[in-house]
């Protein structure tokens, strides 16, 4: 578990069997998603989304997103991380090549709740932060 290691609990990232850790995490996320999709709320008429993002990159790149060069002081992104969006009423199999970062996800959530004063870098449209709208499209 990230951040919970100590004298008697090994740091997962330093463990010898990383493949087993990946399998354990994958199985856990699979069970969690299945349990959420089994709820009445998920099966209802309201629009729901599950967002899965993994932000523990290998740290081998400072390459950011949103037209910011890697060595620029304004680079607030870094690395390539996967994000999966599962919606209950949206189209399936959508991929989006737009580069996003954590602020884009925050911006998307704020927009969904009608919050127009965005927090921190989520407001940085001039630096390329855009909502992830294509991944949350809802079919009529």
Predicted segments with their positions:
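N-terminal pro-sequences and low-complexity stem/linker regions of secreted or lumenal proteins
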Residues: 1-140
């Amino acid at each position: 578990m990230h951040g919970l290691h100590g004298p008697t609990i090994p740091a997962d990232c330093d463990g010898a069997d990383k493949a087993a850790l990946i399998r354990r995490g994958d199985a856990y996320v699979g069970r969690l998603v299945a349990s959420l999709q089994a709820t009445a709320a998920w099966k209802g008429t309201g629009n729901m989304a599950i967002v899965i993002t993994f932000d523990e990159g290998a740290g081998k790149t400072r390459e950011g997103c949103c037209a910011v060069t890697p060595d620029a002081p304004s680079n607030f992104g870094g690395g390539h991380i996967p994000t999966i969006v599962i919606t209950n009423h949206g189209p399936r199999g959508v991929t989006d090549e737009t580069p996003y970062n954590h602020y884009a996800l925050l911006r998307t959530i704020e927009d969904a709740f009608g919050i127009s004063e965005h927090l921190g870098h989520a407001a940085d449209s001039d630096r390329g932060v855009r909502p992830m709208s294509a991944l949350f499209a809802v079919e009529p």
